[in-house]
Amino acid sequence: MIYFDNAATTMRKPDCVIDAVADAMRNFGNSGRGAHEASLDASRMIYETRERISELFNLGNPLQVAFTSNSTESLNMAIQGLFSKGDHVITTVLEHNSV
């Protein structure tokens, strides 16, 4: 599992991130929810991002890349997928609140 979360500990986003988010909000629709151009563009961008992440981490299959809405959801998915009731897990005070 690879976990990326710096939103809780960093300052404001760089201008390039702000610009990219604004562009996506202007030009993309709900992926997978329609056959209109904005929806198809969003679906393509998401799949291209999956491909790039898959290549970066040598996963082999872009569909192995999962996106979630936030850190808590990601951690819950990983924890519930890895551990069963009764398992013993040791953490530190540095872990995310959901852990």
Predicted regions and their residues:
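Pyridoxal 5′-phosphate
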Residues: 1-99
